[in-house]
């Protein structure tokens, strides 16, 4: 049966079998590479059907973040798991002060990696996710960090939205390995605004 991490991802395998979880992944990375029009059409259909699964959160937004920032074996691992439905990843960016204010979540350098501290709010599908893609302010700009949802130092306050979707406010205070940061120059992600991608 499905691990607790993915409980509720009841249609994940079906969506993967249809290729929908690989829709927004480039063909060079083993995906379909349908582009924005194909993704929009599927999103329209899932919206009309009131699908509660994290198609937009994981198969579109998270895969776009990984595709933009990650190279090498880590890219292959993350995209492969997302495309197969083996794992869910969600972007944790919004904070209590909203998008217009500077990020309050910080990642400071440690001897063997990073110390991540802060709080994110309204993270859709976070209770179902395996990985949280967390934006944080670093000494050299904005970074995006991959964090295991069940790691010690990650505290979720789960709730349900009015349409029944799982969400959470999340507190972070934990150490991360050096390779938890996904790429460099990550501020380009934030220029896409709150309705990105």
What residues fall within each predicted segment?
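Internal helix-loop-helix
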Residues: 17-76, 80, 84, 125-128
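Glycine-rich beta->alpha junctions and the first turn(s) of the following alpha-helix
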Residues: 48, 154-197
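Short secondary-structure junction/hinge motifs that connect adjacent elements
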Residues: 1-17
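A short core secondary-structure module
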Residues: 92, 119-155
């Amino acid at each position: 049966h499905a691990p607790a991490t993915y409980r509720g991802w009841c249609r994940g395998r079906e969506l993967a079998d249809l290729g929908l979880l690989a829709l927004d992944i480039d063909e060079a990375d083993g995906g379909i590479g349908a582009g924005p029009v194909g993704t929009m059409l599927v999103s329209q259909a899932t919206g009309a059907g009131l699908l509660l699964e994290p198609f937009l959160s994981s198969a579109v937004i998270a895969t776009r973040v990984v595709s933009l920032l990650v190279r090498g074996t880590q890219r292959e691992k993350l995209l492969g798991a997302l495309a197969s439905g083996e794992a869910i990843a969600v972007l944790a960016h919004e904070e209590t002060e909203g998008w217009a204010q500077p990020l309050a979540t910080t990642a400071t350098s440690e001897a063997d990696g990073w110390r991540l501290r802060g709080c994110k709010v309204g993270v859709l599908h976070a209770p179902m996710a395996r990985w949280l893609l967390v934006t944080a302010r670093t000494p050299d700009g904005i970074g995006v960090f991959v964090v295991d949802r069940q790691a010690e130092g990650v505290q979720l306050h789960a709730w349900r939205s009015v349409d029944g979707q799982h969400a959470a406010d999340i507190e972070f205070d934990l150490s991360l390995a050096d390779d938890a940061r996904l790429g460099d120059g990550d501020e380009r992600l934030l220029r896409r605004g709150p309705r990105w991608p």
